Amino acid sequence: MRNITTSAYTPTEFTIENISDTVAKISAWPFEIGYGITLAHPLRRLLYTSTIGYAPTAIHIDGVAHEFDSMRGMLEDVALFIINLKKLRFKIKGESNKEIVEFSFKGSKEIYGKDLNNDQVEVVNKDAYLATINEDAELKFTLIVEKGIGYVPSEEIKELINDPKFIALDAFFTPVREATYDIEKVLFEDNPDYEKVVLTVTTDGQITPNEAFQNALEAMYKQLSVFDKITNVRSVIKNQATSNELENTKLLQNITDLNLSARSYNCLEKAGVVYIGELALMSVSELAGLKNLGKKSLDEIKNIMESIGFPVGTSKLSDNKEILKNKIAELKAQNEG
């Protein structure tokens, strides 16, 4: 039987299951009936539309006038070459939002994504096929790769570039290949009328599913912040965050609950790290700087923290950092006493 309440229950459980480097299942529960889809559906849309990625936006091929042209010595015509090119998933290596990259191939060979890796860009699907040229061919092309979100049609790209030498391309920036959700019934406090949201996120390798999910959450918070100018909801929520709420998470549990390897645990123990929350409060560089903590141990700790929903250096604690620090200090003082 459901009791009469004056506010909806706030979910406390969150897990991330990394199925592979590009696929993850993200679960949260328990939600009140109807709340699951209310949150899951917009998050799914934001995963597709607001996740930053990279895409080729325009190309100039030496000796080619337009996309319906052909090129001597290349098996593919230009249209098929461009189709193959758009299947390649690029990453810009530096901090730039745009790179103009030149490529040159000569002699008989098959060209794959890995052949386009250089100091400026990386192709994450290295084995993707691009073209075949014979011994008489000389393929030279200049590619514009840009950072963006969502999808931008070639007509708009053409206006932005405004250079007749370049062929504008449809730009598919989103690195999210698939985002789906399931709403499951879950038992909570002997009541079956609660929901569990399970999001499955698949990316193309430009970023991890966890990064894509974090981007979607940030986009949602930013869009909703416009209402805070009137309602001041954020301040109210922040003031309601107490140490009692933190106790419902794993952050105040001992690091022994992480089931770390002996080497990793000993390094943390010698550094004075007692609680899981201390790891969440650290940046990756701070964790890596702990004495005798090797790369293998660093990766193990990062992966485990990510799997429980509190990655090392997480931004999720921005509003509760001081509360968590004070609570951990209080617990340590009690233990020493």
Swiss-Prot record:
Residues 247-337 are annotated as: Alpha C-terminal domain (alpha-CTD). One of its GO terms (cellular component) is DNA-directed RNA polymerase complex. CDD domains: RNAP_alpha_NTD (cd06928). Residues 1-231 are annotated as: Alpha N-terminal domain (alpha-NTD). The keyword Nucleotidyltransferase applies. One of its GO terms (molecular function) is DNA-directed RNA polymerase activity. Its EC number is 2.7.7.6. It comes from the Bacteria. It catalyses: RNA(n) + a ribonucleoside 5'-triphosphate = RNA(n+1) + diphosphate. Belongs to the RNA polymerase alpha chain family. Homodimer. The RNAP catalytic core consists of 2 alpha, 1 beta, 1 beta' and 1 omega subunit. When a sigma factor is associated with the core the holoenzyme is formed, which can initiate transcription. The N-terminal domain is essential for RNAP assembly and basal transcription, whereas the C-terminal domain is involved in interaction with transcriptional regulators and with upstream promoter elements. DNA-dependent RNA polymerase catalyzes the transcription of DNA into RNA using the four ribonucleoside triphosphates as substrates. This is DNA-directed RNA polymerase subunit alpha. It comes from Campylobacter jejuni subsp. jejuni serotype O:23/36 (strain 81-176).
